[in-house]
Amino acid sequence: MNPTYITLFSCAGVGCYGFKMNGFDCIASNELLEPRIEIQRVNHKCKYESGYICGDATLSETHQRIYDEINMWHEKEKLEQVDVVFATPPCQGMSTANYKKNDHEQIRNSLVVQAIKLIKAIHPKVFVFENVRAFMKSICTDVSGEDMVIKDSIYKNLSEDYNIYWKVINFKDYGVPSSRPRTIVIGTSKQLTHISPLHLFPTRQKEILLKDSIGKFARLQYCEKDKTDPFHFARPFPEYMLDWIKDLKEGETAFDNPDETKPCTFDADGNRIINKGAYMGNKYRRLIWDRPGACIATRSDVMSSQDTIHPCDNRVLSIRELMTLMTIPNTFRWTNHDDKLTVENSDEYLKENEGNIRRCIGEAVPTQIGSDIASKIRTMLDFESFITKAELQKDSDMNFYIQAFKLVGEIPIIDSFDKINALPSELSHVSIKLASIADSLAYIPQLCAYYSAADSIDIDIVGLNEEDNNKIESLFKLIKMGSNVSVNFRPSVSVYKHYDVVVENGTCRAIPQRKVNKKSSFENELQLSFFD
């Protein structure tokens, strides 16, 4: 049976499309708005029609429909336990993009609590929250009726049954060609003794510059369409705005112009009123080729939204460019008519669908992030099945954890997670020392995730013989550790070299910084660097 998942507040299903790409079956998908559920239908997200649950997540009948779907899977598909619940509660009350907040923010944030209730009732093997960077510090009304920060509510209700880890990351450092600072929270059931939340976090990757992601698309003049792609077009805008942006260089905003060409409105007498405000800094601004794309907002159709103007062309980014910046594959469909869409018949289609498509892209989890997490969950679930049921999947030869277990036997994953979670986390350059095969295999994947935001992670494996070094090197080829990681095999190290973290005898500890008067020296050094 394929691994399974349920999505809550799933919008158009862009992020969880990554689960579909990795062979997961969707049991149920809950979303409030029917047009977005329809996009999920077009992409054949759920196995059964009854799995598309359009409804208010605060209502008990919506919860019951989800439970009914799970019960149907128990009977029809012989489901034992839901593998994943993936939740992305609406974030308007927490987001900095929507600065006009209101008195209902706290109630809206309490949609998070509906997800917590469902996770507690469903008891999946893994749960994942994705939200804005302020997510864990925002106030919600807990299940108990008490007001508390979301972090406390999650831990209070779920930490008894789950190992939980969270961090704020920028998706541009994890394979997405646009900036998107977000909070990821992952919980793994304590019944799964060989899966840690750190195993499931996205892998650090090199930044992808704007020129390398959308630079391949055709340049477009005012109102021009790409003759080969109906989703790549220059969206029309009032021609008088052309004077505001036509002379802008990369990174400049129309508010850098002389007064006569600054963005404005007109009063009843026809007098120009220059737009002013504290939040104008990223409006009418050109993007920069040699940086990742800016964070994509829901109003990418207008130049007055945040960072929407092409680096060279006088237009906002096209739908195809936005899809690329959010790693949405071309196989993703927005309507049942996409396969018949041509440049010639696209006007009516875009008139009806463009606004919804752009809003869905602006609210989405990038598909790459969903895919990376899903791939890692599948790998770890296969490992857990191998340990508990002696089941080998067809790709087990490529599963790092199965092969590591065959080499060294028991790997103390949960013990190592608890110890790693107690380490200092805010380090820009991390130096780590290990001295055994078992410690290396248990700790290195998790330490790489724990310190994924660091500029560099320098790992020394010390004192092993050549045969053991070769075994570890061979296994590491089966896993992506991150573009900021280098692994070095050393016969010995100088006593003067400082390590931030030392792992030995199945435990790890942080080492305080000390002054060093002599330079470290190494002999017969073999260094292997892994850049993904």
Q: Could you describe each region identified by the protein language model?
A:
Residues 68-79, 92-283:
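Class I S-adenosyl-L-methionine
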Residues 4-5, 429-431:
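Residues that mark the start of a beta-strand
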Residues 151-154, 446-447, 470-482, 500-501:
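Short, aromatic/basic amphipathic alpha-helical patches
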Residues 27, 83, 125, 428, ...:
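Conserved acidic residues
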Residues 239-408, 518-531:
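C-terminal target-recognition/interaction regions appended to catalytic cores
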Residues 272, 485-487, 508-510:
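Short linear proline/tyrosine/threonine-rich motifs used for host-factor recruitment
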Residues 407-423, 435-442:
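A short, well-structured beta->alpha microelement
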Residues 2-122, 133-147:
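Core alpha/beta nucleotide-donor-binding catalytic domains of modification enzymes
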